[in-house]
């Protein structure tokens, strides 16, 4: 069973993930994702979308952030499961602009920091874009 400090440091890492999903500040990307991380999710057509971390970083950098669009911020931790004091899976719900994601984040404690090494994402809900 991990100690209290381990839990707190993992929750801090999840907070960094939530911040990145909201402000898209890629200067902090390497404090959230391991360089070798892989992301996977199904597209609307049912095809699997594999995405290396470097490509995801470029996607975040190339568009406006939810924060810059004054999008609502929504985030919650649904589950934390430690395999060991250095490996955990965290299930989260997080909104990024008009998309509400359900993510499974695999974390490893690497060189003193919790980093995401794999992310499996699912679009749980698509919000309508407000028209003025």
Whereabouts are the PLM-identified features?
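Short, low-complexity N-terminal intrinsically disordered segments enriched in polar/charged residues
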Residues: 1-35, 51-54
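Short beta-strand segments enriched in hydrophobic/aromatic residues
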Residues: 33, 94, 120-121
């Amino acid at each position: 069973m991990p100690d209290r400090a381990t839990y707190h440091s993992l929750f801090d890492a999840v907070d960094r993930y939530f911040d990145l999903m909201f402000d898209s500040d890629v200067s902090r990307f390497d404090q959230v994702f391991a360089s070798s991380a892989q992301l996977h999710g199904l597209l609307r057509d049912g095809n699997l979308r594999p995405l290396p971390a470097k490509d995801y970083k470029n996607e975040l950098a190339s568009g406006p952030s939810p924060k810059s669009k004054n999008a609502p911020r929504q985030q919650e931790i649904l589950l934390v499961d430690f395999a060991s004091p250095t490996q955990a899976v965290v299930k989260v719900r997080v909104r990024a602009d008009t998309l509400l994601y359900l993510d499974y984040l695999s974390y490893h404690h690497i060189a003193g920091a919790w980093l995401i090494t794999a992310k499996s994402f699912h679009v749980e809900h698509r919000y309508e874009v407000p028209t003025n």
